[in-house]
């Protein structure tokens, strides 16, 4: 299984070699790593409230408040109507409640719950003889479930979930669509409620909605609900959700932006995990279309498509090769070089870093795709969040690359930006840059030993000229033990010549390369 970022440095703590296991260099996404899930998605799209079919709420805010107050004054009347035995009165009053719950801002969800009508609405869901009443009750409950977790819990506790699932086979299009929406809101509340809905068998019933007769509004709602069934941490059981893959494989060929967006988000959730999940996503036949969507004009589609491609290349070399073979790399070059926003460039760099963590053939393909120059440009000039991912991409290439590949990286100017990041506040990135520089120094040393450079490690000189030597010296006083030890090791290996050691020192005062390193006070200084 691929290691997460914090495990990667741990695994490498005691090993300093150029060729590392590709699995070790790959990084699954951390929850907080990429801020692509914008507030808008978090706040608005996990739950959706259905507003009025005609936007009658055109009042100014103060007028709207007084209008609402007047509406609430009629609550006792509406409650009585809902609990009456008169079907037409039940419908009329349920519709009024639904309208109250559909106002644009701050609908009175709490007041409606307190009025005690929720169990009655759940009863109305069973009225197969009166689809219009079912529809209005389902709409009202959908909007109650769009509120807080407590609001959602009320809807669940009155036994609505199995009834909503049964309504997915209603002969009424409107009732089915409203049931889909309600289940999406309930599942979108939390992993706990998502699993409750899935546990009642909702997925199979939901997947049945994706048929040739489905209206676009149903496709949009059902795809959104499907994405909520797949999202959240802890993740749903893959055994439950993988049945969605064939449907998602069809949905990503839609021309509708909303359907595409939510289908790609669902795939991004399903591909976020172990290699068996990644393999199932690959076998759903989605890779070719995902690469096409990396060129989509809408960021709302591009972002989850890129997220999914990025997840797939956290897999093993064979899985990563699938994305390479589908020509993902030219699309990634485009994302690095064109005018895309920070979060997209960052995600693209993260994706590339997991490809450069692959084998030497894959590193060569990255080089031949022309990715290194734009990567180095971002490493030097981009915002820090992008620089961090670019540093991983370059460092991983130095870890797995051969002699000529690493020389090519140096020829593209990677040394100075790696040196510049040695003073960044993120200790993991400092370590990543030190590892990259160390791998480069090893190649310089090999060239020196071959007699190609007149007895000089040319890359050590370049690091010195880039003010890297001074920065590495300063890292000897770093709080992080791994950074401090690695800095000492690099200095000792590539800059400490015999003539620099005072003759008066006894041999046993320093034990370089052993388990213990005894340092002079203040560390080494070669300035």
Curated annotation (Swiss-Prot):
ARM repeats lie at residues 109-151, 152-196, 197-234, 235-279, 280-319, 320-362, 363-403, 404-445. It comes from Solanum lycopersicum (Tomato). InterPro entries: ARM-like, ARM-type_fold, Arm_3, Armadillo, Importin-a_IBB, Importin-a_IBB_sf, Importin_alpha. Disulfide bonds: none annotated. One of its GO terms (biological process) is NLS-bearing protein import into nucleus. Forms a complex with importin subunit beta-1. Signal peptide: none annotated. It is found in: Cytoplasm. PANTHER family: IMPORTIN ALPHA (PTHR23316). It comes from the Eukaryota. Binds specifically and directly to substrates containing either a simple or bipartite NLS motif. Promotes docking of import substrates to the nuclear envelope. Seems to act as a cytosolic receptor for both simple and bipartite NLS motifs. The keyword Signal does not apply. Belongs to the importin alpha family. Keywords: Cytoplasm, Protein transport, Repeat, Transport. Its main location: cytoplasm. Residues 1-58 form the IBB domain. GO terms for molecular function: nuclear import signal receptor activity; nuclear localization sequence binding. SUPFAM superfamilies: ARM repeat. This is Importin subunit alpha.
């Amino acid at each position: 299984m691929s290691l997460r970022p914090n495990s990667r440095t741990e695994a490498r703590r005691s090993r300093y070699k150029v060729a590392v296991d590709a699995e070790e260099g790959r990084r699954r996404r951390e929850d907080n790593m990429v801020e692509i899930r914008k507030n808008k998605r978090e706040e608005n799209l996990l739950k959706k409230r259905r507003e009025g079919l005609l936007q009658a709420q055109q009042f100014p805010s103060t007028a709207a408040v007084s209008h609402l107050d007047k509406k609430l004054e009629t609550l006792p009347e509406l409650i009585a109507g809902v609990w009456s035995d008169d079907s037409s009165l039940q419908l009329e009053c349920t519709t009024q409640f639904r309208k109250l719950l559909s106002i644009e801002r701050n609908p009175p969800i709490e007041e409606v719950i307190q009025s005690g009508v929720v169990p009655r609405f759940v009863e109305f869901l069973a009225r197969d003889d009166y689809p219009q009443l079912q529809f209005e009750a389902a709409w009202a409950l959908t909007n109650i479930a769009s509120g807080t977790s407590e609001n959602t819990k009320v809807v669940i506790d009155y036994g609505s979930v199995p009834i909503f699932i049964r309504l997915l086979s209603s002969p009424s299009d409107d009732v089915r669509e409203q049931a889909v929406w309600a289940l999406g809101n309930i599942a979108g509340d939390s992993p706990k409620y998502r699993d409750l809905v899935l546990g009642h068998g909702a997925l199979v019933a939901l997947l049945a909605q994706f048929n040739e007769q489905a209206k676009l509004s149903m496709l949009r709602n059902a795809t959104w609900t499907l994405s909520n069934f797949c999202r959240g941490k802890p993740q749903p059981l893959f055994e439950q959700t993988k049945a969605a893959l064939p449907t998602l494989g069809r949905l990503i060929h839609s021309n509708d932006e909303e359907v595409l967006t939510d289908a790609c988000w669902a795939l991004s959730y399903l591909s976020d995990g172990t290699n068996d999940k990644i393999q199932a996503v690959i076998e759903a036949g989605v890779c070719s279309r995902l690469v096409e969507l990396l060129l989509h004009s809408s960021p709302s589609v591009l972002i989850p498509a890129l997220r999914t491609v990025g997840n797939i290349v956290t897999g093993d070399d064979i899985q990563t090769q699938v994305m390479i073979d589908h020509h993902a790399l030219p699309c990634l070059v485009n994302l690095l070089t064109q005018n895309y926003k920070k979060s997209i460039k960052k995600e693209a760099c993260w994706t590339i870093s997991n490809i450069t963590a692959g084998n030497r053939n894959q590193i060569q393909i990255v080089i031949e795709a022309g990715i290194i120059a734009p990567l180095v440009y971002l490493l030097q000039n981009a915002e820090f969040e992008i620089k961090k991912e670019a540093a991983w991409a370059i460092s991983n290439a130095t870890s797995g690359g051969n002699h000529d590949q690493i020389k090519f990286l140096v020829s593209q100017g990677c040394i100075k930006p790696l040196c510049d990041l040695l003073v960044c506040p993120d200790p993991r990135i400092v370590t990543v840059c030190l590892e990259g520089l160390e791998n480069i120094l090893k190649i310089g040393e090999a060239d020196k030993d071959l007699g190609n450079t007149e007895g000089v490690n040319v890359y050590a000189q370049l690091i010195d000229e880039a003010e890297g030597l001074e920065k590495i010296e300063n890292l000897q006083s770093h709080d992080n033990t791994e950074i401090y030890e690695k800095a000492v090791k690099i200095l000792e290996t590539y800059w400490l010549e015999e003539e620099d050691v005072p003759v008066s020192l006894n041999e046993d005062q320093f034990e370089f390369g052993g388990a213990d390193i005894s340092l002079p006070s203040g560390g080494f200084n070669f300035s």
